[in-house]
Amino acid sequence: MLVALVVSSVTCLGVILTSIFNVRFEIKGKTFHVYWMVALLGALIVLFSSLSLSEWWQVLTKSGGINPIKILVLFLSMSLISIFLDELGFFAHLANWTMLRFKKNQISLFVTLYIFVSLLTMFTSNDIIILTLTPFILFFCKNAKISPIPYLVSEFIAANTWSMIFIIGNPTNIYLASSFNIAFTEYFKVMAIPTLLTGLVEFLILFLIFMGKLKDPIQPNPLKLEKENRPLTILGLSVLGICTILLVLSGYFALPMYLISAVSLGALVLLSLIYFICTRTKPSVVGHTLRRAPYEIIPFVIGMFTLVLALEKYGVTQNIANFFGSSGTTFVYGLTSAFSANLINNIPMSVLYSSICNFSSENIRLRAIYSSIIGSNIGAFLSPLGALAGIMWLSILKKYDVKFSYLDFVKYGCTVGVPSLLVALSSLLLFI
């Protein structure tokens, strides 16, 4: 037990430090982040000292219910469909059209961007939306000669709030909900109102914070974008739409969500290749899409899952569940999960809390799960470490010479995040 506890603690500390300082290196122009290597190294040490390969493999690939591999398939498939649309320029064209459509003043632009990001993140991955739209916002604000800070902060917060409404909005939703066989529609019925109320409250807070900056005049200049490939864009949107509908219906027909997303991605790739063959053009979009996939999440999730498995084996997660008790479940699990996400990142936190919830009393388990899901989403904007997107988001801002420090992130994030978290958890009490 001691070995598993020490290795897990040191690994989490290593993940925190390498994430905060964005430790990475390059080999032949390819950038490699170190955080996932730390997680993988810790997992290997635990695997050869505290776990047997057979029990590790059995849990990793269990046929009944959900397992880490199925969750990774679901997340990567949905991410790749979103990246495919991004490679075609769909998000950039849509954002450009939206911003120019409401170009009279910054207030209408601010409202439009918030709604735009909120809608997109519901049906795609919040991380993909953040990483896709951030460079566009920076370019647009530079051309319009306005401060990008109000739009960048609202984009990040909106993406990590409205991602709560559907299971597919965030890999943490996928992991926690799927681990307890919560269906798509069942999840939506519980999370719809808390997400809506939280989104409205945080928008009001954001508006009050940035109201002064939004009074400056705007001088919009259309960005020069490459011509959109209409047939492939229609194909990508059709696949995404059909996939989303099937995910909604999956609970009624006992269709595995990971299988729906994987088949959808396979169909998209196959039909795209047929299109390229028929038009005698290079399938560069497919290649670029596959290269941009967040593959680093695979060793990271499996590594952190291995650490949690060791902690579970030696009763650590059960002791935490016993310590939490059965009173004040919503706020205990919600607040501690949000805090934990900023210590070890929200994906490992979800793996940890999945095990803790599993040991909670049956009469409070659902409340604990949904509270942890809320904490995993809103906790992402309390500090950059809360989510992988936060770390990458800050690195993009540094690349474009935007002055926005770690403390700035915490200041804005906590100002909006703390009341948002309280509203979300309070409204959850109405449904569970």
Q: How should each PLM-predicted stretch be described?
A:
Residues 1-83, 87, 193-199, 203-313, ...:
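Hydrophobic transmembrane alpha-helices of multi-pass small-molecule transporters
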Residues 7-22, 52-57, 103, 132-148, ...:
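Hydrophobic alpha-helical transmembrane segments
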Residues 56-146, 296-361:
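Membrane-embedded alpha-helical segments and adjacent helix-loop junctions characteristic
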Residues 78-86, 104-105, 116-126, 158-166, ...:
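Helix-loop-helix module between adjacent transmembrane segments
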Residues 94, 128-139, 152, 166-180, ...:
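Re-entrant/interfacial helical elements at transmembrane boundaries that shape
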Residues 114, 135, 155-156, 169, ...:
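Residue-level recognition of transmembrane alpha-helices
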Residues 140, 144-231, 364, 392-426:
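Membrane-core helix-loop-helix motifs of multi-pass transport proteins
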Residues 188-198, 330-432:
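C-terminal transmembrane helix pair
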